[in-house]
């Protein structure tokens, strides 16, 4: 649900040349407000007068052996359909858990709860990881809910999360604790 698109490279490439070609293609229809190669990713940010928010495209530079499947990308606003190699939802959930533990970004919690509500299970996690997740979620403050999460949500949904937090995600983490094993060195 985030207002960004995340991609991963699947084979080595000339990143500078790729960024030049991608920027050139996007500038035909969008204002490119940022385009650079960062330490971990190739980053582009776009805007258009047709949509009120900017779109961030992030292409991770590390090649990983993720669980993927071919999906059809489509939009109700266009007739073009494009096949993509996409992470499975289970892989996406694993990545979101890992990302939240790495960067403590509230949008990762929103994405985890969103997927849980649509039937994607949490990956198997040991008790120490579950405790870290729960503690970090509890540490999220009002500013994160109102500003960071609020900037990507509509008002009615924002009000629910501001008042209840990640109640459903916390419930699922609590359930997972009941069957989790302690990690032993």
Report residues per predicted region.
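Short, charge-patterned binding micro-sites
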Residues: 1-2
């Amino acid at each position: 649900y985030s207002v960004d698109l995340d991609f991963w490279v699947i084979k080595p490439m000339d990143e500078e040349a790729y960024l030049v070609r991608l920027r050139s293609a996007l500038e035909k229809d969008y204002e490119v407000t940022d385009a650079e190669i960062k330490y971990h990713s190739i980053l582009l940010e776009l805007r258009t007068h047709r949509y009120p928010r900017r779109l961030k495209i992030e292409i991770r530079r590390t090649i990983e052996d993720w669980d993927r499947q071919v999906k059809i990308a489509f939009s109700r606003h266009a007739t073009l359909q494009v096949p993509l190699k996409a992470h499975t939802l289970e892989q996406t959930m694993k990545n979101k858990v890992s990302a939240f533990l790495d960067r403590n970004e509230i949008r990762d919690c929103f994405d985890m709860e969103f997927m849980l509500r649509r039937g994607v299970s949490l990956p198997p996690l040991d008790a120490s990881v579950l405790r870290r997740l729960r503690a970090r979620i509890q540490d999220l403050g009002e500013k994160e809910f109102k500003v960071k999460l609020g900037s990507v949500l509509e008002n009615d949904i924002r009000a629910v999360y501001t008042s209840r937090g990640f109640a459903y995600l916390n419930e699922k983490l609590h359930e997972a604790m009941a069957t989790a094993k302690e990690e032993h060195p």
